[in-house]
């Protein structure tokens, strides 16, 4: 009986690993836009939080301090969106898997 439980657990672990790998591949392709200042500044991040693009409205180019603040805010907005998307996708990758009590994934 114990052998059957171990085999089932190993199958679940393999399926979970495949699902997690697929979710990580999807995240690498993901692009998320964060914005600030009524979209005067926007930042596009990949699912791995690599900055792909920064857009700045020309009307604020003379205000360096505002630009700096808005870039930071837009980056943080995009970063929070990546975190939420990552949590959702990684959570759905383990959906239906019966994990032992207290078992937590590293994300």
UniProtKB/Swiss-Prot annotation:
Annotated Gene Ontology cellular component terms: bacterial nucleoid; cytosol
Domain of life of the organism encoding this protein: Bacteria
Signal peptide extent: none
UniProt keyword annotation of Cytoplasm present: yes
MF term (GO), any: DNA binding
Assembly mode: Homodimer.
Role noted for this protein: Binds to DNA and alters its conformation. May be involved in regulation of gene expression, nucleoid organization and DNA protection.
Annotated protein name in UniProt: Nucleoid-associated protein Xfasm12_1216
């Amino acid at each position: 009986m114990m052998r059957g439980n171990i085999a089932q657990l190993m199958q679940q672990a393999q399926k979970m690993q495949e699902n997690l790998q697929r979710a990580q591949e999807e995240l690498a392709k993901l692009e998320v836009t964060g914005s600030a200042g009524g979209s005067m500044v926007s930042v596009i991040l990949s699912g791995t939080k690599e900055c792909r693009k920064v857009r700045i409205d020309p009307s604020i180019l003379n205000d360096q301090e505002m630009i700096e603040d808005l870039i930071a805010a837009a980056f943080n907005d995009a970063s929070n969106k990546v975190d939420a998307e990552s949590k959702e996708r990684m959570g759905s990758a383990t959906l239906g898997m019966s994990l032992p009590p207290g078992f937590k994934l590293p994300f």
